[in-house]
Regions:
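FAD-site-proximal beta/loop scaffold in flavoenzymes
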Residues: 282, 287, 292-309, 398, ...
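Structural micro-motif
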Residues: 16-35, 123-137
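Non-catalytic, surface beta->alpha helical segment in thiol-disulfide oxidoreductase systems
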Residues: 27-60, 135-163
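Rossmann-like nucleotide/phosphate-binding core characteristic of flavoprotein oxidoreductases
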Residues: 7, 104, 108-110, 114, ...
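Thiol-based oxidoreductase modules, predominantly thioredoxin-like and allied folds used
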Residues: 10-19, 107-121
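Beta1-alpha1 glycine-rich phosphate/pyrophosphate-binding loop at the start
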Residues: 79-87, 91-93, 97-99, 104, ...
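Glycine-rich dinucleotide-binding loop and its adjacent helix/turn
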Residues: 160, 166-172, 281-334, 428-431
Length: 477
């Protein structure tokens, strides 16, 4: 395979020497780059190999903006990273490619991708039950889907940063949009088309959409994927003079006065008279004892990525909505038994999904079931403790894994003491996406708008942008 890759360019060569089998390193001008692969990077990881080569030649396209690159260079080293992957995992390449890019930027970083299927002895010894699993100098720091910004934040927390290399600055805009999903992208485009100076500050472009496998209800687009839609959102925004500032997380807001201040943990501050909050929502946690302790060791959120680790085993799916029942149907094809646990007295999933799940012989469904505890033996999950809400009876179900599928929670924490929110944490808006604070607007899943749908979020983002522009023209902000 490597010889085939090298045959594409006279600037690439392959040298075979002594060492571990199925392991190779990438060198540039005869010098080690810190990027290595233990396994054959085909399947979804073939792009990781190609992108690593392109990045080292200065032609890659997955580097973040200079401010984020500066954060990478400010990491205190040395840092030795190892990522265990499955070649069928759709989330693994994002993590591998992000860490390879960081390694390219920092001379004291190294990163090894390991195919867990080939090195099963290591997977067992490390008790890995979810991928991608990232180890930093032997310590597990990340499991599951992740993007450049999330991984960088974890490395900063683990190793610290050289403060002399960090950025302290204030950047001024007419409109700052928080979030890069359908609502945020729409708001940014509509604002830019009004001739305003616009910034999109987001953890990742696409938001929650990126985790959706198939999309068939975006009118005029019969079928697409979350990843494809996310990339199209980025491409559309790039058609306008919009500052796309990805891999940022706002930790402090100051909303008094005409100009609002939004600050990141790394010292960047954004200032604008209008802020459109389109931060979306994220997976809810059970918030029961044992859940956090066993994430990646039996507690999972993505059946597509982590399902293969439970082949022939008994798993539970907590949640009876569409995502939960879809997960149960998918897992039933590889697991010996799937137990669905729903808190309410009936399933919330579409009837067609319920009928399909009930037709499967290895799927059992329990409603009125409250999850009390994730039970483990110190190494991995061995069971789940539940209570029948009607009888009060408690029981322990012995199993091997738990997939949590209980919906989404609004990403509004940093604003909850600043603007009005409802009990679930959604930002309360009027029919024009205005909040109770002048100059602050909200759109999409983070707001109280009913029906959390992509197409609705796009419309809400446009509405928020038009409301902000109208208020600007009228002198309200």
């Amino acid at each position: 395979m490597l010889h085939d890759v090298a045959s594409c360019s006279s600037h690439i060569s392959v040298q075979v020497g002594d060492g571990d089998g199925l392991c190779f390193h990438i060198l540039r001008d005869g010098e080690m780059t810190g990027i290595s692969f233990r396994g054959i990077p085909n399947g979804h990881e073939f792009t990781s190999l190609l992108l690593a080569i392109l990045n080292l030649d200065g032609k890659g396209k997955n580097f973040p903006d200079e401010s984020v690159c500066r954060r990478v260079r400010a990491l205190k080293g040395p840092v030795h990273l190892t990522t265990y992957v499955s070649l069928t995992c759709t989330n693994c390449p994002d993590v591998v490619q992000a860490l390879n890019a960081m390694t390219t930027l920092h001379p004291q970083l190294s990163h090894v991708m390991v195919d867990g299927a080939i090195h099963q002895d290591e997977v067992n010894a490390l008790k890995i039950q979810g991928v991608p699993a990232v180890f930093a100098d032997g310590k597990l720091i990340h499991v599951g889907r992740g993007d450049f910004g999330q991984l960088l934040s974890k490395l900063e927390a683990e190793y610290g940063v050289d403060e002399s290399m960090t950025e302290q600055s204030i950047k001024d805009y007419d409109v700052v949009v928080l979030g890069g999903g359908p609502a945020g992208s729409s708001a940014a485009i509509y604002s830019a088309r009004k001739g305003l100076k616009v910034a999109v500050v987001a953890e990742r472009i696409g938001g929650q959409v990126k985790e959706t496998v198939g999309i068939e209800n975006l009118i005029s687009v019969p079928e697409t994927t979350g990843a494809h839609l996310a990339e199209n959102l980025r491409l559309h925004m790039q058609q306008y003079p919009i500052s796309i500032l990805e891999h940022r997380h706002i930790v402090k807001v100051e909303l008094d006065g005409k100009y609002k201040l939004l600050s990141t943990a790394t010292g960047e501050t954004f200032r604008a008279p209008a802020v459109i909050v389109a931060t979306g929502a994220s997976w809810r946690r059970l918030n029961v004892p044992g859940e956090n302790d066993y994430i990646g060791r039996g507690v999972a959120f993505c059946p597509h990525c982590d399902g293969p680790f439970y082949k022939g085993k008994h798993v539970a799916v907590v949640g009876g909505g569409n995502s939960g029942i879809e997960a149960a149907i998918d897992l039933a094809g590889i697991c010996s038994k799937v137990t669905v646990l729903e808190f309410l007295d009936g399933l919330k999933a579409d009837r067609v999904l319920q009928d399909k799940a009930r037709s499967l012989s290895n799927v059992e469904i329990f409603v009125s079931s409250q999850t009390l505890e994730v039970v483990g033996n110190g190494d991995k999950v061995v069971g789940i403790r539940v209570k029948d809400r009607n009888t009060g009876e408690e029981r322990l179900i012995s199993l091997d894994g738990i997939f949590v599928q209980i919906g989404l929670a609004a990403n509004s924490a940093v604003f909850r003491d600043m603007v009005e929110t409802n009990r679930p944490g959604e930002i309360v808006i009027d029919t024009h996406c205005r909040t109770n604070v002048a100059g602050i607007y909200a759109a999409g899943d983070v707001s109280t708008v009913p029906y959390k749908q992509i197409i609705i979020s796009m419309g809400e983002g446009a509405k928020a942008a038009l409301s902000a522009f109208e208020d600007r023209v009228r002198g309200v902000i």
